[in-house]
């Protein structure tokens, strides 16, 4: 997209300050909360918020509240996005400030991952019980079966497989299946559940949802069930999941609609308190998928949460990125 001379000046003016340029570099890596940005930059919240406000007013970043937290990400459709991208590409990776920011971002990610993995390890044995605390699991599973369709599917890949429930739920509709998870404790339980279900052609593997190592277009059904709200970069996870979807294949995502159960961050390591359609659908479209179903399952009690199910299909004639992430 071409910009007017005045638009270029506005973009450069907004980005043309060292802290704001560092903020853009960090947000180019992933969405981050204001508190995380303050910690990485070692600056006060009022100061960081002021810089973020200027970047948002220039259309370079997007602000989105999530419960009591506020997150920022690079604006997806900003007219100045390409210009900023070129500016960031010019920065030397060895620049002391940028390198220090990258190191601190790595620390934040590591601590986030350690906390989540410790939580999963502690709770693996009672995972199905925990998963059912705020939703009617039977209703959700029935809706997932309807949304997935009868199949049969040649290959089902479940990302963030947890205790293996999606594998056993959909097991009779898939010729073969693969579940990936970072938690060995979860994988051990999933193996037991898969064995009990008699699913001989179902493999459990230690793997990262952001970099699965699987070839593009390898599955005609990919599921991501109650995983995104734990992740620091859900958009990247959706992109990787979509990359695995074969032509005419289906991606099924189940997660919470936005809610205000703030205690879930500490009690259950939720990073995000649900997702708007306005987030998920553009991520699917950007990955080359077409939305097929958008289902909301309201809670049966005041304490419950609304569950959303999004399904999207890759058009039969679409090209697929084959290389593994």
State where each predicted segment sits.
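Amphipathic alpha-helical dimerization/coiled-coil segments
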Residues: 2, 79-128
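N-terminal helix-turn-helix DNA-binding core of bacterial DNA-binding proteins
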Residues: 6-46, 69-78, 143-145
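Conserved alpha-helix/loop element of class I SAM-dependent methyltransferases that forms part
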Residues: 135-154
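Class I SAM-dependent methyltransferase SAM/SAH-binding core
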Residues: 155-157, 162-211
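A short acidic, Gly/Pro-enriched loop at the edge of an enzyme's catalytic core
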Residues: 210-222
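A short glycine-rich, Lys/Arg-flanked "PGG" loop and its adjoining helix->strand segment in the class I
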Residues: 235-250
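C-terminal alpha-helical "lid/dimerization" subdomain adjacent to the S-adenosyl-L-methionine
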Residues: 250-306
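Core SAM-dependent methyltransferase catalytic element
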Residues: 296-325
